[in-house]
Each structure stands twice: as structure tokens, then as C-alpha cells.
Regions:
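Long, low-complexity segments enriched in small/aliphatic residues
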Residues: 237-312
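Non-catalytic alpha/beta scaffold blocks inside enzyme catalytic domains
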Residues: 1-255, 308-312
Length: 312
């Protein structure tokens, strides 16, 4: 019945999802509200403001609807007060129709292909551990294994082992490069932004000495005298599904617990006044594969030229 978008530009961050939103909007009787940077999303929306203050005001003044979809972007979460904004978004969902009997419309829009699956595996800093930004600072660590993380700058000092498929930023910082396979060169399990487990199959073999990531890590573990308990992709998948059964339920969504949203909404939320901006600044160069493409570079240059002309 209604969609609340917070700190996201679905047209750039998730074009397929944006097309679904537009399709639903064209069918009528859908109210869309945007909090963040204004943009052409290909459908009409009510603009409620740029920051957390606007979100708090919206929570106080808006009326509940039948089924509300709350879409929280990484632009809202990748800030020092991201936790507070997430709590406010949960409060909006709880109060305005985002959570109810048979309906959970509280959603986070991710901008990295592997992030949802990583969260399912618990890839988050434990108590007292370092997050990625802290790891990258000078003097934090002696050795860093970089598994294709090209959007973070690692300060001088640490010895960096890079495992990836393209000669992007992470490879340029590396002391040792172990060439990995691109997603088209290996079979894998992916989890999309809605939490649906999906499988992909290898199209071609990786070139040269490149290997699939799991094989590289398995070989390293053996060389270090601590061999991992698998010798094939099928054995690795068996271990994965034993530890995390929902990875075996392909094309199914693991439902979220509404109680967790209630607990999140109850947290204190002291958010800043800064505008909530989208994380995507150049649609055509958002990942290492796109940045290695001459066609994408040309598209980016043409798009930037149009923006410059519009500004003039």
C-alpha cells in the first residue's frame, strides 16, 4: 500500500527492484515517500526531507497504512549514526504498518553482491574485534588477507595478500596476489538482497593460474599445517549447509523475526542532522568488473558529461 525509502536511490542501487516498484506504482493506489537526496526514480513520490529529523517528523505525523514497505539504504547505515537511523526506520515500520500479521515490510537495501550471504554467515566484528575500517588503519594488523575488497584503502604497514579476479585497487595495494576466479568462472551460492538463496554455475574456466577462492584457501591451510576439513566444492557445501541449513533451501526466503524489529525499534536513537545520501556515485563503475570495462568507462564519461552540461 505504501513505500518509505530512506537514504537510497533504488534506480541506481537496485535497478531490477526499482523496475518492480515502478510496475506497482503504475498499477495505482501506491504512496511512495522518500527521505534523502532527491532523484529521478522514474515514478512520483512525496519528498519528506533529507535527514533523520525528517524521518522523526514523518513517524510522528504519518498515518498507518495496510502494508508498508520500509526500504533502508546503505547511505543511511554507512554513517557514524547509522544504528540510530536503523532504529528510527524500525520504529517507522512498527508504527505505520511495516510489521503485522503475515507481513514483514522492514527491508535493508544492500549494495554489495555478497553482503547478505556474509551477514547470514555471521561475518560481523565480534566483541572487542576490529571492523574493516579499523583493520585498514596503519599499525592495526601485521598481515591482511584481502578477499576482493577493492572499495577500502589499506594504509601502509600491513603485509597484504590479495585474492581476487581483477587488477583493481586492492590488487595495486597488495604485496602478494593470488589470482582468483570471477563469478562467471566458478559455481557458487549467492543470497540476494531479499534473503533468497540462489545458485550459479560456472560458464568458463578461470584463465592461467587463477583458482576458485575456496581452493586457494584450502591450499593455504594445508601449507600452514592446519588443513580445512574439505577437499572439494561439494564437501565444502555439505559443511556449509550443516552449519547454516537455510543455504540448502534454494530459491526460498528465510523469514525475518518480527521480535527483532521490535527490539531494534526500542533502542535509543540520537541521529545527526546531516543529509542521508545514496552510496552510489557512479552507476557505471560500482565494482571491479565494471571498472575493468572500456564500455563502462565510456558510459561513465558520457554520464558525467551530461551532468556537467546540466550544471552549467
Amino acid at each position: 500500500d505504501a513505500i518509505l525509502i530512506i537514504g537510497a536511490n533504488p534506480r541506481k542501487e537496485a535497478p531490477v527492484l526499482n523496475a518492480r516498484i515502478r510496475k506497482r506504482w503504475l498499477s495505482g493506489e501506491l504512496t511512495i515517500t522518500l527521505i534523502g537526496a532527491q532523484a529521478d526514480l522514474t515514478y512520483d513520490y512525496d519528498y519528506a526531507g533529507a535527514g533523520a529529523e525528517s524521518l522523526m517528523q514523518f513517524i510522528e505525523t504519518a498515518q498507518p497504512v495496510g502494508k508498508l514497505l520500509v526500504l533502508v539504504g546503505q547511505g543511511a547505515l554507512s554513517r557514524s549514526d547509522g544504528g540510530a537511523i536503523l532504529a528510527l526506520a524500525a520504529k517507522a515500520a512498527q508504527k505505520l504498518g511495516g510489521v503485522g500479521e503475515g507481513w514483514n515490510g522492514f527491508s535493508v537495501l544492500h549494495t554489495a553482491a555478497a553482503r547478505v550471504g556474509a551477514l547470514d554467515l555471521g561475518f560481523t566484528p565480534g566483541a572487542g574485534a576490529l571492523d574493516a575500517q579499523a583493520m585498514a588503519k596503519a599499525g592495526a594488523l601485521d598481515v591482511i588477507f584481502n578477499l576482493g575488497a577493492d572499495e577500502i584503502a589499506i594504509d601502509p604497514g600491513a603485509f597484504v595478500v590479495y585474492i581476487g579476479s581483477h587488477g583493481d585497487r586492492g590488487a595495486h595495494r597488495a604485496d602478494v596476489i593470488l589470482p582468483g576466479a570471477a563469478y562467471t568462472e566458478k559455481s557458487g551460492i549467492f543470497v540476494n538482497t531479499e534473503g533468497r538463496v540462489q545458485m550459479s554455475s560456472r560458464v568458463v574456466f578461470p584463465p592461467g593460474d587463477a583458482r576458485e577462492d575456496w581452493a586457494i584457501l584450502r591450499a593455504l591451510s594445508g601449507a600452514l599445517g592446519q588443513p580445512l576439513p574439505f577437499d572439494s566444492l561439494s564437501a565444502l557445501r555439505k559443511k556449509l549447509i550443516e552449519a547454516y541449513p537455510h543455504f540448502g533451501r534454494v530459491d526460498q526466503i528465510a523469514p525475518g523475526a518480527a521480535t527483532q524489529i521490535s527490539a531494534l525499534a526500542a533502542q535509543p536513537a540520537q541521529a545527526g542532522r546531516e543529509p542521508v545520501l545514496s552510496m552510489i556515485h557512479d552507476f557505471y563503475l560500482t565494482n571491479p568488473i565494471a571498472r575493468a570495462s572500456a564500455v563502462m568507462a565510456e558510459c561513465s564519461a558520457l554520464a558525467q558529461g551530461r551532468l556537467t552540461q546540466a550544471a552549467e
